[in-house]
C-alpha cells in the first residue's frame, strides 16, 4: 500500500502471510478506484442528462402558442391527432411513443421519456436514487424567517438571534443567563463613552447631525441588548455594571448620581413587577422570544430610518429628545412612588438623559415603530407630569438643562413658548397616565401580563366607555394623526406617526402651530358621544385652510404654518422644515403626543385626585390613541384600509391564537383572489384591539401580500407566523358598514366637505374604483396634491393634455388651425366624461425611443404586473398586441410572445416602426391590448391602454401604464382616431371622385358663422365641418356630371377607403353598443351622457357620438372579452323592430353612394345648423320614406311622418329637428361598412391584401331581386354569374333597379317570393363566398360573417323562408370572402339552423356544411339518442353501406368514436368496441355522457381497423346538434349520413351569456 497509515502492523507475520494480506489490500484499492471511476462517469452522465432535459424544457416553452398540444415536445413533430399526449412523470414534457414509454415506478405504471428513464436507471444503479447527496443544513432553524439579509453565521448573527436559536429550556436556565452577562457588561463602557462623545459633538458641531445620527444607530443594538440582559438580573449586578462603566470612562458626578438612581429605580420596578405577576417569572420563554423579536426588529432600524429629521433639525433637538426619552423611562419605572420621591428622582435624572435604557420587557404595543426611531434624534419624550408648581418648575429646569448646550437665543424663545403650555401638558399627562392606567391596574390585575406584551384589554368596569373609546380611537387616529405612508416590504414595515399636538387644560384644548400660536376652544357641557368629542377636538371649521382648527392638524411643507383641512395629512419630515424657533417646541409637543400614543404599556399609576372635564377628555383621547391601529379611506372612498399590529398575550402566544379565522382563495368583486376573515373570537385581541369583523379582507399579513393568493398560500403565510409575538395586518373593509358605523364619516353628505373630495371628485370614479395596488395611505396635503393622484391617472391625463395644447401646435395636416379638438372647456365636465367605464386590472411597463436620424420608433415591452387570474384562479397565458393607430393593418400590427401561466409576465421585447417623421409621430396613438392565449378556446381579452406618443418620453424612460378593461370609445384618444379615420375616408372618397369626374366648379366658401350652430357642444361637429370646408378637393358636383361618366369602380373606391382606414374593419369587443341611448337612428352630442355605469358591459347610455355615422361605427365595435357576448340591453336592441328600416336605409344610401348618386360631401347647401341639404330628387323613394320612419326618441314627431312611397319631386324635404339627424346625414354619406358579429381574437385584424380579392356577388344577387318585380320572366338577369366583371354597374340601370326593388319590398312583392322559392337552390349554390377568388388564408373568419344577403332574408319577405346556416370549412377561412363580402352583408349573422332543404334524408338534428354538395355519402349509421337524469345516452346501433379504402380488398373492423362538443371545445369523448370486419357492422353499444345537451353537438366518427396495416382509418363523420332535438326518456332513433370531414358545419365561438343568437328573432 502506498499509504502506510492504511496498512496494519504486519511485522509479526511471515513474508508469505504478509504478501497475501497486501494483495488483499491492493485488490480492495483497485475496486475502490473502479467504483470511484464508475461513480464519476455516472455523475457526468447525470449532469449531461439534466442539461438536456433543461434544454428541452426551454424549447418547449417556446412552443406555447403554436398548437403545442399536437406536437411532441421532445422531437417537435406533430404526433397527436386528438391533441392528447402523455406527459413524462418526471419532466412533465409531452412525448410520443418514440420519445418515451411506459415504465414501472414502485407500484404503478407511469409514462416517462427516454431521458428520464435513463436518468432513473443511473440513479438506481449508483445508489443516488435512495442516497441523495447531503445538503448543508442551515445553522439556524425555526419557524421564523431571518429578518437580516446577511448570511446567518456565528460571526454576524446578533446576540438576540443567537439566543433565539437556543432551545427555550436552555434560555430559561440561570446558567444560560449568567453566561450572557459578561458580553453585555463589556458593552456598557462603550455605550457610555459613545453617549459622552455624542454630547460633546453636539455642543461643538451643530451643523453635522448625520454623524451623530449614524453613531447612535451603530450603538442602539448593543444598548438594547444590554437592557434585555440587565432586566434579568438583580440590583447588585446593575450597580456592578455601572461601577465598571464609570471606572472605564470618567463621567461627571451628576451623571454618576443619575446612573445610581436609575439602577435603584430599575430594582424597585422589577420587584414590583415580580410581586404583581407571579406567572410572568415562570413564562420567560415567550418573553425571551418577544425580546429577541424586538431586538431583531431593532436591527432593521439603520436601513429604515429616514434622514429628514437629522437634516432639518439641529443637535438641540437630539438632546431634547434624549431627555424626553429618559423622562418617559422614569415614568414607566416609578409606579408606586410618592410625589417627593418622584420629584427627587426626576431631578437626579436630569444629568443622565443620555443613558437611554428603556426596558424592553415593558415595551411595547408598537415595538417596531418604537425601535425604528430609537436613535438619538427620534426618541419620543414623555414628560414627567404632576399637579404641583414644583413639577412645572422641574419641567422648565429640565428643558433649560437640555437647552444650555445649544444656542442661547433659540432656547430663550423656546423657554418663553413653553411657559404657556407647561400647565396644560402636566395636567393632560397626569390624566392620561393616572386615571385610566391606575383603573386598569385596580380592576384587572391580570392585565399586567397583557400590558407587558403590548396588548391592552378594555376596562371591564365601563363597557360603554370602552366601546366609545375604541371607536373614537380609530376616528382620531385616522383624522388627527399625521401618518407617514406605509411602506410595505419584506423585511418589515415601518410606520412613522406624528400626532398633532392636542393638549387640554381645565376645559380647553390648544392646537399649536409651528410658530407657537395657539387657538383655544371651550369644551361644551354635553360631551357624551364620540361625535361630540370630535366636534370639541376639531371644531366646526371644516374647510378652513389657514386656521389651525379643523378636522385635523398637519404641518405645511416649509411654511411652518399648520393647515386645518379635513382629514389632512402631512409627512413627518415636512413638519421639520418650518422655522427653527417654533419647530423645536412643535417637535417636542408632537413627540410627546407620539410617545403617549405609541408608548410602552405603563403600569404606573399616581395618586388619586379630582379630574376635571378637560383632563377626562384628554385622558380618553390619549387612551384611544394608545393602540397601534389606524384606519384610512381608500382613494375611491369606498373602502377602509386598516393597518394594525396585534400582539399575542402570554396565554395565546403558546397556541398562536389571535382570535381570527382567515380563509384564502376566495373570489373578490374585482375577480381577483383574496383572503377574508370568516370568524372573530369575542374578547380576543382581534376583537378588542383590531376591531376586526367577519368579511374584512386581509390585504397583507406580516408584510406578505395575500391578494391573488390561493388557499394553500394563505395557509402557509399564516402558519409561518404562528409563533410570532406580534402580527402586522393590513385589512380592507367596505366604507358603508351595516349598522351605521361609518366612523370615518364617508357618507355622501360629508364627502363634499372633506379634503378627499378635492382630489378625486373631479376625476372619473371608474379610475379609482379598481386600483391595482392602491397606496393605502395617500398623502393629500394641498402642497403635495400632485403626488396624491392615483397612479392610474398617469395613463390618462397625459392624453388629456395632448388634446388641449400639445398636438395643436404641430404641423398636422388635419389639425392645423383647429382649436381644442372636441374637449369642453369645463375641466370637470371633461374629466368626468372623457373616459370610459372600464375596470383597471394590472399595469404594463413600456418604454419608447425615437431616432430622428432613422425616423424609427422603438417600443420596448418590458413586463406586466397584477394581471387578473382566470375565474377558476389559474394564471393566464398573456401576450400583447400593438397597433400604431389609426393604422390597423398588418403593417402596423406587432405581437409579443406568449408567456405561459403567469400573472406577472416578463417579455423584454422590442418592436420597431420605421418611416415615421416627427409630425407623424405626434399624431399617432399606440394601442396595447393584452390577451390571454387559450389553446382550447377563444383567446380572452384582458384589457388595453392607449398611449399618446406626443405625451410620453421618447428617450427610453420606462413608464407604467394601467390596463383598462373595456375602454370605451368616448375616450378622447379614440375620438381623435375616429376623426382621423373620417378625414382619410372623406379625402380618399373625394379624390376618387375627382379622378372620375370630367368637370368641377370652383369651391364656394361659406362663412364661419354657419358652422357654429351647436354652440353648446360639439367642437367635433364644427371641426369636421371646418375641415371638410377647407379641403381643396371639396368641389360642387354639377347635376350634369352624372352624364359624363357612366361607371364608378366601386371596388377600387372601397378598397382605397379600406386601406386608408387601416386595411380592414376593426373587430371590436362588444356588439352594437352605440344604440343604447339613441336607438341607432342617429346620435346626439357626446356630452349629453353624464352618468356612467360600471362593469364590463356598460351598455346603458353611451355618450360617444362619432361623426362617421352608424355605418362607420360598425367598424368601430368593441372586442369580445373572452367568450362574453351581448348584455340584455344589446340583445333587446338587436331585436329592435326599427332595425329593418335602418338596414334598408343604409342599403339604399349605400347603393346611391357607390353608383354615383348626386349627393355627396362636396359643397352642398347647408342648413343654418351646418347640416347638408339633400334634395328629394337625389333620394330614392325608399330613402325618403326611411327619413321619416319613427324612432324611439322621436315620439313627438310620429304624427308628422309619412307612410308609403312619396312621389318624386325636387323640393327640399322637411327635416325633423332631431339631435341625431346631422349624424344621420353623415351616415348616408359614408361608404359601406360591415356589420360585424362576434369575433375571436384571431379576427382582430384583416389582411391588407384581403380586400382586393372580394367578389361583388351581393351586387348581382341584389340586381336579381330588383328585377324580379318588373320582369318575372327575365331569366337572363337572374342567370348572371357573380364574377369580377360585375364590378362595374351602370348607374342608370342601378337607379331603376333600386327604385323597383324599393317599391317591391315596400309593397310586399309576391312575385319575388315565388321566384325565391323556385330559385332557392340555384341561388344558394351561386352564393358560396370565395368562388373564383384568390387570396391568402387569414385563418380567422370561420363562418361568422357568412349570412343571408339582405334581399333574401326572411324579415324582408312577407312569407318567411327557412333560415340558412352559416357554414365553416377550410375554405371559409380564406380571405377571399371574409372582408368585402362581410362589408356587403349588412344584416347580422343568422342563427345556426338545419341546411337540410337541399340535402335530403338527413338524420334528426344532423347539420352539414356546404361542401356536402360535392361530397359523396360514405355510408349511414343508425343512432338512438336519449336524455335522462344521468345525462345523454347515445346508442350506436348499426351502420350500413360503409366505403372501404380504395385498393384494399380486406374489410376493416369498424368502430365509432363519439365526441361531445361545446362550440370548438371537446367536452367528453367515448368509443365503441370494434365490430366484425364488414361494411354493415352491428354495434348495439351505449355511450353515456354526463352533461346537459344544451349548446352541445355530437360528432360521430366511424373509423376502421385494418389490423397491422392501419388501425385508425377514417370512414365517415356525422354531426348532430342536440339543441335542435327534444330528447327525453324515449329514444330518438334515426339514420345519419356519413360525409367527409370537410363537410362539418361551423360552430363558431360559444356565446355563453346569450341563449339565442342574432337571428333568433326570426324563429
UniProtKB/Swiss-Prot annotation:
Can you cite an annotated GO cellular component?
A: axon
The domain of life for this entry's organism is Eukaryota
* Polar residues bias spans: 172-182, 356-367, 379-389, 1086-1097, 1242-1255, 1278-1288
RabBD domain spans which residues? 7-133
Can you give the residue ranges of the PDZ domain?
643-733
One Pfam family hit: RIM2a_ZnF
ZnF locations on chain (FYVE-type)? 66-121
Which residues take part in binding Zn(2+) 2? 88, 91, 113, 116
Localization per record: Synapse
Compositionally biased intervals (Basic residues):
1112-1121
Tissue note = Restricted to discrete puncta in synapse-rich regions of the nervous system including the nerve ring, the ventral nerve cord and the dorsal nerve cord. Localized expression was found in the head.
GO biological process, any: mating behavior
The UniProt keywords, alphabetically, are: Exocytosis, Metal-binding, Repeat, Synapse, Zinc, Zinc-finger
Does the entry feature the keyword Chaperone, yes or no? no
Q: Where does Zn(2+) 1 bind?
A: 72, 75, 96, 99
Q: Which SUPFAM superfamilies match?
A: C2 domain (Calcium/lipid-binding domain, CaLB), FYVE/PHD zinc finger, PDZ domain-like
Basic and acidic residues biased stretches: 25-35, 326-345, 1129-1154
Query: Which spans does this entry mark as compositional bias, Low complexity?
Result: 190-284, 300-316, 395-415, 1181-1230, 1256-1277, 1297-1311
> Which GO molecular function terms does the record list?
small GTPase binding; structural constituent of presynaptic active zone; zinc ion binding
Give the matching InterPro entries: C2_dom, C2_domain_sf, PDZ, PDZ_sf, Rab_BD, Rim-like, RIM_Znf, Znf_FYVE-rel
Domain named C2: residues = 840-962, 1417-1536
Disordered as annotated region, ranges: 25-50, 128-466, 582-605, 1054-1163, 1177-1311, 1346-1373
Function, as annotated, reads: Regulates the efficiency of a post-docking step of the release pathway. Acts after vesicle docking likely via regulating priming. May regulate the conformational changes in syntaxin. Binding of vesicles via rab-3[GTP] to Rim may signal the presence of a docked synaptic vesicle. Rim may then signal to unc-13 to change the conformation of syntaxin from the closed to the open state. Syntaxin could then engage synaptobrevin on the docked vesicle to form SNARE complexes and to prime the vesicle for release. Not required for the development or the structural organization of synapses.
Q: What is this protein called?
A: Rab-3-interacting molecule unc-10
**Which organism does this sequence originate in?**
Caenorhabditis elegans
Which gene carries the instructions for this protein? unc-10
Amino acid at each position: 500500500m502506498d499509504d502506510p497509515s492504511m496498512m496494519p502492523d504486519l511485522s509479526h507475520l511471515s513474508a508469505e502471510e504478509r504478501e497475501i494480506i497486501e494483495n488483499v489490500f491492493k485488490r480492495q484499492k483497485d475496486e475502490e478506484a473502479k467504483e470511484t471511476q464508475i461513480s464519476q462517469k455516472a455523475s457526468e452522465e447525470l449532469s449531461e442528462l439534466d442539461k438536456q432535459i433543461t434544454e428541452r424544457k426551454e424549447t418547449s416553452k417556446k412552443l406555447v402558442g403554436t398548437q403545442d398540444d399536437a406536437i411532441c415536445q421532445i422531437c417537435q413533430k406533430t404526433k397527436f391527432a386528438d391533441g392528447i399526449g402523455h406527459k413524462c412523470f418526471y419532466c412533465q414534457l409531452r412525448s410520443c411513443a418514440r420519445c418515451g414509454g411506459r415504465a414501472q415506478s414502485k407500484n404503478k405504471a407511469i409514462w416517462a421519456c427516454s431521458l428520464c428513464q435513463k436518468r432513473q436507471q443511473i440513479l438506481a444503479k449508483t445508489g443516488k436514487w435512495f442516497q441523495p447527496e447531503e445538503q448543508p443544513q442551515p445553522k439556524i432553524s425555526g419557524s421564523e424567517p431571518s429578518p437580516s439579509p446577511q448570511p446567518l453565521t456565528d460571526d454576524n448573527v446578533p446576540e438576540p438571534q443567537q439566543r433565539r436559536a437556543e432551545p427555550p429550556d436552555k434560555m430559561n436556565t440561570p446558567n444560560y443567563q449568567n453566561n450572557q452577562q459578561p458580553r453585555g457588561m463589556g458593552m456598557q463602557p462603550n455605550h457610555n463613552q459613545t453617549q459622552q462623545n455624542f454630547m460633546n459633538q453636539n455642543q461643538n458641531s451643530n451643523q453635522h447631525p448625520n454623524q451623530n445620527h449614524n453613531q447612535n444607530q451603530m450603538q442602539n443594538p448593543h444598548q438594547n441588548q444590554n437592557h434585555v440582559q440587565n432586566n434579568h438580573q438583580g440590583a447588585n449586578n446593575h450597580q456592578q455594571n455601572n461601577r465598571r462603566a464609570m471606572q472605564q470612562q470618567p463621567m461627571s458626578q451628576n451623571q454618576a448620581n443619575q446612573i445610581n438612581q436609575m439602577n435603584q429605580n430599575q430594582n424597585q420596578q422589577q420587584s414590583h413587577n415580580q410581586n404583581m405577576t407571579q406567572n410572568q417569572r415562570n413564562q420567560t420563554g415567550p418573553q425571551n422570544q418577544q425580546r429577541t423579536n424586538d431586538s431583531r426588529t431593532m436591527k432593521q432600524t439603520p436601513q429604515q430610518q429616514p434622514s429628514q429629521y437629522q437634516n432639518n433639525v439641529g443637535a438641540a433637538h437630539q438632546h431634547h429628545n434624549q431627555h424626553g426619552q429618559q423622562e418617559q423611562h422614569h415614568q414607566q419605572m416609578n409606579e408606586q412612588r410618592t410625589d417627593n420621591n418622584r420629584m427627587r428622582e426626576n431631578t437626579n435624572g436630569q444629568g443622565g438623559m443620555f443613558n437611554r435604557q428603556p426596558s424592553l420587557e415593558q415595551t411595547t404595543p408598537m415595538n417596531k415603530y418604537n425601535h425604528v426611531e430609537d436613535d438619538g434624534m427620534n426618541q419620543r419624550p414623555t414628560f414627567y407630569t404632576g399637579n404641583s408648581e414644583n413639577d412645572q418648575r422641574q419641567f422648565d429646569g429640565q428643558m433649560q438643562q437640555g437647552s444650555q448646550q445649544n444656542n442661547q437665543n433659540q432656547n430663550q424663545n423656546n423657554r418663553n413658548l413653553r411657559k404657556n403650555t407647561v400647565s396644560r401638558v402636566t395636567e393632560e399627562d397626569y390624566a392620561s397616565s393616572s386615571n385610566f392606567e391606575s383603573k386598569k391596574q385596580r380592576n384587572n390585575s391580570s392585565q399586567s401580563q397583557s400590558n407587558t406584551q403590548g396588548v391592552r384589554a378594555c376596562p371591564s368596569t365601563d363597557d360603554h366607555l370602552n366601546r366609545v373609546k375604541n371607536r373614537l380611537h380609530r376616528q382620531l387616529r385616522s383624522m388627527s394623526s399625521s401618518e407617514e405612508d406605509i411602506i410595505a416590504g419584506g423585511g418589515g414595515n415601518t410606520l412613522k406617526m406624528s400626532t398633532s399636538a392636542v393638549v387640554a387644560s381645565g376645559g380647553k384644548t390648544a392646537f399649536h402651530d409651528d410658530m407657537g400660536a395657539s387657538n383655544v376652544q371651550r369644551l361644551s357641557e354635553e360631551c357624551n358621544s364620540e361625535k361630540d368629542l370630535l366636534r370639541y377636538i376639531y371644531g366646526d371649521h371644516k374647510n378652513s385652510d389657514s386656521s389651525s382648527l379643523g378636522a385635523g392638524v398637519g404641518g405645511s411643507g416649509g411654511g411652518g404654518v399648520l393647515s386645518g383641512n379635513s382629514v389632512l395629512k402631512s409627512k413627518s419630515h415636512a413638519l421639520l422644515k418650518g422655522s427653527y424657533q417654533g419647530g423645536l417646541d412643535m417637535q417636542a409637543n408632537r413627540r410627546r403626543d407620539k410617545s403617549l400614543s405609541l408608548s410602552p404599556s405603563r403600569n404606573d399609576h399616581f395618586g388619586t385626585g379630582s379630574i376635571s372635564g378637560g383632563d377626562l377628555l384628554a385622558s380618553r383621547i390619549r387612551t384611544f390613541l394608545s393602540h397601534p391601529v389606524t384606519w384610512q379611506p381608500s382613494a375611491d372612498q369606498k373602502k377602509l384600509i386598516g393597518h394594525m399590529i396585534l400582539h399575542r398575550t402570554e396565554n395565546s402566544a403558546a397556541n398562536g391564537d389571535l382570535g381570527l379565522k382567515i380563509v384564502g382563495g376566495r373570489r373578490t368583486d374585482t375577480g381577483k383572489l383574496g383572503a377574508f376573515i370568516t370568524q372573530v373570537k369575542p374578547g380576543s385581541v382581534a376583537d378588542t384591539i383590531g376591531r376586526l369583523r367577519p368579511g374584512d379582507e386581509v390585504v397583507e399579513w406580516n408584510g406578505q401580500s395575500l391578494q391573488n393568493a390561493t388557499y394553500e398560500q394563505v395557509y402557509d403565510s399564516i402558519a409561518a407566523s404562528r409563533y410570532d409575538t406580534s402580527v402586522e395586518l393590513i385589512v380592507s373593509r367596505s366604507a358603508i358598514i351595516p349598522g351605521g358605523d361609518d366612523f370615518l364619516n364617508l357618507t355622501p353628505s360629508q364627502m363634499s366637505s372633506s379634503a378627499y373630495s378635492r382630489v378625486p371628485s373631479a376625476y372619473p370614479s371608474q379610475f379609482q374604483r379598481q386600483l391595482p395596488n392602491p397606496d393605502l395611505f395617500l398623502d393629500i396635503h394641498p402642497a403635495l396634491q400632485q403626488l396624491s393622484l392615483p397612479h392610474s391617472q398617469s395613463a390618462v391625463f397625459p392624453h388629456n393634455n395632448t388634446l388641449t395644447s400639445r398636438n395643436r401646435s404641430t404641423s398636422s395636416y388635419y389639425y392645423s388651425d383647429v382649436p381644442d379638438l372636441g374637449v369642453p372647456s369645463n375641466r370637470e365636465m371633461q374629466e368626468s366624461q372623457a373616459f370610459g367605464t372600464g375596470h383597471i386590472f394590472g399595469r404594463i411597463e413600456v418604454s419608447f425611443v425615437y431616432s430622428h436620424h432613422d425616423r424609427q420608433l422603438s417600443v420596448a415591452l418590458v413586463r406586466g404586473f397584477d394581471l387578473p387570474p382566470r375565474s377558476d384562479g389559474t394564471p393566464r397565458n398573456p401576450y400583447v398586441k400593438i397597433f400604431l393607430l389609426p393604422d390597423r393593418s398588418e403593417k402596423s400590427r406587432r405581437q409579443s410572445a406568449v408567456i405561459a401561466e403567469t400573472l406577472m409576465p416578463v417579455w423584454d421585447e422590442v418592436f420597431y416602426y420605421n418611416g415615421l417623421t416627427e409630425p407623424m409621430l405626434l399624431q399617432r396613438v399606440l394601442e396595447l391590448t393584452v390577451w390571454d392565449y387559450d389553446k382550447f378556446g377563444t383567446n380572452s381579452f384582458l384589457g388595453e391602454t392607449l398611449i399618446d406618443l406626443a405625451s410620453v418620453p421618447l428617450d427610453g424612460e420606462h413608464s407604467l401604464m394601467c390596463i383598462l378593461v373595456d375602454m370605451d370609445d368616448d375616450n378622447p384618444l379614440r375620438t381623435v382616431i375616429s376623426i382621423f379615420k373620417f378625414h382619410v375616408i372623406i379625402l380618399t372618397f373625394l379624390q376618387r371622385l375627382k379622378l372620375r369626374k370630367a368637370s368641377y366648379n370652383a369651391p364656394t366658401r361659406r362663412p364661419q358663422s354657419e358652422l357654429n350652430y351647436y354652440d353648446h357642444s360639439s367642437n367635433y361637429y364644427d371641426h369636421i365641418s371646418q375641415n371638410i370646408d377647407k379641403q381643396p378637393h371639396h368641389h360642387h358636383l354639377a347635376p350634369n356630371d352624372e352624364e359624363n361618366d357612366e361607371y364608378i369602380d366601386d371596388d377600387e373606391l372601397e378598397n382605397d377607403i379600406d386601406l386608408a382606414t387601416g386595411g380592414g374593419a376593426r373587430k371590436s369587443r362588444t356588439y352594437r353598443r352605440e344604440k343604447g341611448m339613441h336607438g341607432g337612428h342617429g346620435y346626439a352630442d357626446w356630452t349629453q351622457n353624464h352618468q356612467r355605469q360600471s362593469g364590463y358591459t356598460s351598455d346603458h347610455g353611451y355618450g360617444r357620438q362619432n361623426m362617421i355615422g352608424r355605418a362607420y361605427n360598425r367598424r368601430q365595435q368593441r372586442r369580445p372579452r373572452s367568450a362574453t357576448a351581448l348584455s340584455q340591453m344589446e340583445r333587446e336592441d338587436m331585436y329592435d323592430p326599427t332595425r329593418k328600416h335602418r338596414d334598408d336605409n343604409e342599403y339604399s344610401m349605400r347603393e346611391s353612394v357607390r353608383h354615383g348618386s348626386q349627393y355627396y360631401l362636396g359643397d352642398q347647401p347647408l342648413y343654418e345648423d351646418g347640416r347638408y341639404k339633400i334634395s328629394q330628387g337625389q333620394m330614392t323613394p325608399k330613402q325618403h320614406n326611411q327619413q321619416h320612419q319613427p324612432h324611439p326618441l322621436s315620439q313627438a314627431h310620429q304624427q308628422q311622418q309619412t307612410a308609403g312611397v312619396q312621389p318624386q319631386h325636387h323640393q327640399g324635404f322637411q327635416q325633423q329637428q332631431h339631435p341625431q339627424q346631422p349624424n344621420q346625414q353623415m351616415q348616408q354619406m359614408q361608404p359601406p361598412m360591415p356589420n360585424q358579429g362576434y369575433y375571436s381574437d384571431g379576427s382582430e385584424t384583416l389582411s391588407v391584401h384581403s380586400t382586393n380579392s372580394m367578389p361583388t356577388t351581393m351586387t348581382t344577387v341584389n340586381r336579381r331581386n330588383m328585377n324580379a318585380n318588373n320582369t318575372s320572366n327575365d331569366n337572363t338577369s337572374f342567370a348572371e354569374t357573380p364574377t369580377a366583371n360585375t364590378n362595374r354597374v351602370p348607374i342608370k340601370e342601378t337607379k331603376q333597379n333600386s327604385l323597383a326593388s324599393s317599391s317591391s319590398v315596400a309593397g310586399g312583392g309576391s312575385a319575388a317570393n315565388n321566384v325565391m322559392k323556385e330559385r332557392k337552390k340555384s341561388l344558394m349554390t351561386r352564393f358560396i363566398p370565395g368562388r373564383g377568388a384568390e387570396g391568402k388564408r387569414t385563418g380567422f373568419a370561420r363562418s361568422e360573417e357568412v349570412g343571408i344577403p339582405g334581399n333574401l332574408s326572411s324579415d324582408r319577405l312577407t312569407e318567411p323562408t327557412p333560415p340558412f346556416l352559416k357554414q365553416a370549412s377550410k375554405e371559409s377561412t380564406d380571405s377571399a370572402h371574409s372582408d368585402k363580402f362581410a362589408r356587403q352583408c349588412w344584416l347580422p349573422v343568422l342563427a345556426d339552423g338545419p341546411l337540410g332543404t337541399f340535402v335530403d334524408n338527413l338524420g334528426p338534428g344532423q347539420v352539414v356544411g356546404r361542401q356536402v354538395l360535392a361530397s359523396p355519402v360514405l355510408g349511414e349509421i343508425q343512432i338512438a339518442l336519449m336524455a335522462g337524469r344521468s345525462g345523454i345516452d347515445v346508442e350506436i346501433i348499426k351502420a350500413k353501406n360503409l366505403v372501404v379504402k380504395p385498393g384494399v380488398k380486406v374489410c376493416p373492423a369498424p368502430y365509432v368514436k363519439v365526441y361531445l362538443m361545446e362550440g370548438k371545445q371537446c367536452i367528453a369523448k367515448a368509443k365503441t368496441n370494434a365490430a366484425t370486419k364488414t361494411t354493415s357492422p352491428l354495434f348495439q353499444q351505449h355511450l353515456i355522457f354526463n352533461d346537459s345537451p344544451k349548446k352541445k353537438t355530437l360528432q360521430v366518427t366511424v373509423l376502421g381497423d385494418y389490423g397491422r396495416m392501419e388501425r385508425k382509418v377514417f370512414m365517415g363523420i356525422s354531426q348532430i346538434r342536440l339543441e335542435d332535438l327534444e330528447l327525453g326518456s324515449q329514444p330518438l332513433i334515426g339514420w345519419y349520413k356519413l360525409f367527409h370531414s370537410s363537410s362539418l358545419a361551423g360552430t363558431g365561438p360559444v356565446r355563453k351569456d346569450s341563449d339565442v343568437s342574432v337571428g333568433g328573432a326570426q324563429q
